[in-house]
């Protein structure tokens, strides 16, 4: 019995040590992701906004961008590039960002405008709209950290390659944009069943492509994206 007790204590200690090590590793990761922000604070900037988008590649639905200003030195456990966060944790981290953020703006550009101007320009428009949504909020950005994009706007900015994995502010924008768009696609799934929008978010999965063949194109499909584009041509040229 005494041996069993000692083993139990040893296991508990090892488990606690692992938890402490994991917490330290997470603290170091988050600290590293604040390197851009800390350098800008030293330069005198006060309100640094991270900007990112979600939805450039899907065959259906909008492109969504978010602009998020976090308090100085704010750390949110688990916050990372939204593609690296388990889907089961998206909502929890999204809510944590909403609670801690000083300001949040969201820009949504629908599939029709994407078809008109192309996805690259539509992404820029979504980002600019997200920034515009901050107007009227108490905190206004004096610097922008943008994921791999440069914007035509009179605010100091820096484009960061893989910014959502290297800047906590951009990562915050990434999860806000991701959850916002996923919620929209889940709603579209109820309106247009048979394409699996709630699961695939409009990307060209097997289920989505089968839905296109079985039911045709919906009003939210991007007609400038293949294979939707070819299907449009086929329907106009019987």
Curated annotation (Swiss-Prot):
Its main location: cytoplasm. Keywords: Cytoplasm, Endonuclease, Hydrolase, Manganese, Metal-binding, Nuclease. A divalent metal cation binds at residues 52-53, 147. One of its GO terms (molecular function) is RNA-DNA hybrid ribonuclease activity. Residues 46-237 form the RNase H type-2 domain. It is an enzyme of class 3 (hydrolase). The keyword Metal-binding applies. Disulfide bonds: none annotated. Manganese or magnesium. Binds 1 divalent metal ion per monomer in the absence of substrate. May bind a second metal ion after substrate binding. It is found in: Cytoplasm. It catalyses: Endonucleolytic cleavage to 5'-phosphomonoester. GO terms for biological process: DNA replication, removal of RNA primer; mismatch repair. One of its GO terms (cellular component) is cytoplasm. Its EC number is 3.1.26.4. Its cofactor is Mn(2+); Mg(2+). Belongs to the RNase HII family. Endonuclease that specifically degrades the RNA of RNA-DNA hybrids. This is Ribonuclease HII. It comes from Streptococcus pyogenes serotype M28 (strain MGAS6180). The gene is rnhB.
């Amino acid at each position: 019995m005494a041996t069993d007790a000692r083993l139990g204590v040893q296991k508990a200690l090892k488990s606690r040590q692992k938890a402490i090590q994991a917490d330290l590793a997470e603290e170091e990761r988050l600290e590293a992701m604040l390197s851009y922000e800390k350098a800008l604070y030293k330069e005198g900037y006060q309100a640094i906004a991270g900007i990112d988008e979600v939805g450039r590649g899907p065959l259906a639905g909008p492109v969504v961008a978010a602009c998020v200003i976090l308090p100085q030195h704010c750390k949110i456990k688990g916050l990372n590039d939204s593609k690296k966060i388990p889907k089961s944790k998206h909502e929890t981290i999204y809510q944590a960002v909403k609670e801690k953020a000083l300001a949040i703006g969201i820009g949504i550009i629908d599939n029709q405008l994407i078809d008109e101007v192309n996805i690259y320009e539509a992404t820029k428009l979504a980002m600019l709209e997200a920034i515009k949504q901050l107007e009227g909020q108490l905190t206004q950005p004096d610097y922008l950290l943008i994921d791999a994009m440069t914007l035509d706007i009179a605010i100091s900015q820096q484009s960061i390659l893989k910014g959502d994995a290297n800047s906590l502010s951009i990562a915050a924008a990434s999860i806000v944009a991701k959850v916002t768009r996923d919620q929209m696609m889940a709603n579209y799934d109820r309106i247009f069943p048979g394409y699996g929008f709630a699961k695939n978010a409009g990307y060209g999965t097997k289920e989505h492509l089968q839905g296109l063949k079985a039911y045709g194109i919906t009003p939210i499909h991007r007609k400038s994206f293949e294979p939707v584009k070819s299907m449009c041509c086929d329907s106009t040229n019987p």
